[in-house]
Amino acid sequence: MGSRRFDAEVYARRLALAAAATADAGLAGLVITPGYDLCYLIGSRAETFERLTALVLPAAGAPAVVLPRLELAALKQSAAAELGLRVCDWVDGDDPYGLVSAVLGGAPVATAVTDSMPALHMLPLADALGVLPVLATDVLRRLRMVKEETEIDALRKAGAAIDRVHARVPEFLVPGRTEADVAADIAEAIVAEGHSEVAFVIVGSGPHGADPHHGYSDRELREGDIVVVDIGGTYGPGYHSDSTRTYSIGEPDSDVAQSYSMLQRAQRAAFEAIRPGVTAEQVDAAARDVLAEAGLAEYFVHRTGHGIGLCVHEEPYIVAGNDLVLVPGMAFSIEPGIYFPGRWGARIEDIVIVTEDGAVSVNNCPHELIVVPVS
């Protein structure tokens, strides 16, 4: 399952880079409340409550953690102590927003906050800072979008773990069992194969496969069903796996096999289009063009991919209109799908990492339509 966080040196480097990016943006500091950004910067998995917990990161100066005194024990699970971060604890009746302002040098001060900060903290913080904060998305997104070697290693291990789960899926796909039965087996396997927890399980059989985000239900599997299985878990220091394969219970009809072969070609075309200097929308177009030529464009109803890391869905998004230029270290899914309402659907998904001259996949289980024999 891996360590729950990285060594302190990793977080120290990230804090320094975030402070530099903050200064480059002309801001006095960042205020990071619990969420993926806080986990990225100091390895904290704190949750947002009505009491303010925040990492305050000045563009120049020492960072500090402002948090309720009752949360001091939980802070020890992060890298804060090893990093030597100043702790500004407070008790009920104190003004935590004033503490944040003081760390940043007093109001008024131009500050960025994470997009996960709730209004119950944003509004009093704006009063304390004397100016409405801006979102820190642009400051932090580049850091999180380009993965370090430690992150890539975690994604590779997560990918290998989810491959092992897919290798076990055929044994679960027995006619007469429900999607929920299969999902329960898969969830157990996700943890058994090395994840710390289950992120999601989609088991879409027959017509349910035409709903990309179906989930699972009490529908019983039947011979002839095409089954979309999209699964993911959390590995080690919070990094995710996410992989989709499509299964056929018994031999598929010829029209299913033909359409699926076009989907394979589309997924391969997108993968082969990836290299530094290419834009995200060009990768999306590579998959979409193959399906359009096959007369299947109207059945591909979502983007080709999404970034992945601490969050299952994060930047970069592989979608039409996104002119973001790909660089080595970016990690994202390639997952074209075709969906025939009321009939069946199919999707193939791998997580890939941009390299100096192309891309590598962290998933290596078969891309073919996987036929599950019926006894």
Swiss-Prot record:
Mn(2+) 1 binds at residues 242, 306, 335, 349. Mn(2+) 2 binds at residues 230, 242, 349. Its EC number is 3.4.13.-. It holds the Pfam family Creatinase_N. SUPFAM superfamilies: Creatinase/aminopeptidase, Creatinase/prolidase N-terminal domain. The chain crosses the membrane at residues 15-35, 55-75. One of its GO terms (biological process) is proteolysis. Belongs to the peptidase M24B family. This is Probable dipeptidase PepE. It comes from Mycobacterium tuberculosis (strain ATCC 25618 / H37Rv). The lineage of its organism: Bacteria, Bacillati, Actinomycetota, Actinomycetes, Mycobacteriales.
